[in-house]
Regions:
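FIC/Doc superfamily catalytic core
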Residues: 1-195
Length: 195
């Protein structure tokens, strides 16, 4: 982490890591674009790919680029981040979900039911308050946040992407180097253990 100054002084390295971050986070969610295609999209080049996958890349880049502006303890900023991350992709972009949801595996087996929608806003606020006020080290708090956030499953879609973004945000407020470390690509490389 002492290399944070090197990262902040090297825009090429920062951009490369940001692209790896976005590719890793989206690949976890079945986005089909390769690292090279993600790079091409962000360089304004035409890529032959599903429009949804291209939109996910552009949306993710926009919100990761605004990371420094976000307050990690603000429900409004969390909703704004979700709105940008899922803009044009889901009906309830930037809003907590209004219906029950569950996570299913490839065979259709339910792995997890999300919190009932009427409890989501209060649980998210409670979680953010805990992260803000806890004396537990931020490395642990950010992991607990990510785990609990995914259990609550506050959105109809985009929970994983926003959870990983927020995990990075929390860590980057503790140590700015985390804004540029491609943690999401590490998670992607260890995806089975992640779930």
């Amino acid at each position: 982490l002492s290399g944070a100054n090197q990262l902040s002084a090297n825009p090429t390295l920062r951009r490369t890591n940001r692209i790896r971050t976005i590719h890793g986070s989206l690949a976890i969610e079945q986005n089909t674009l390769t690292l090279e295609q993600v790079t091409a999209v962000l360089n304004g080049k035409q890529v032959l790919a599903p429009p949804k996958d291209i939109a996910e890349v552009k949306n993710a880049y926009e919100i990761y680029d605004r990371l420094e502006e976000l307050d990690p303890y603000s429900v409004d900023d969390l909703l704004t981040a979700h709105g940008i991350m899922t803009r044009g992709l889901v009906d309830e972009a930037g809003m907590f979900r209004s219906k029950p949801v569950g996570v299913v595996d490839q065979e259709g087996h339910v792995l997890h039911f999300g919190t009932l929608p009427q409890y989501v806003p209060d649980l998210v606020m409670e979680l953010l308050n805990w992260v803000k006020n806890s004396d537990v080290h931020m490395l642990i708090r950010s992991c607990v946040f990510h785990y609990e956030f995914e259990l609550i499953h506050p959105f109809a879609d985009g929970n994983g992407r926003v959870g990983r973004l927020w995990h990075t945000l929390l860590l980057s407020k503790w140590n700015p180097a985390f804004a540029w470390l491609p943690v999401e690509s590490i998670i992607h490389d260890r995806q089975e253990a992640y779930y």
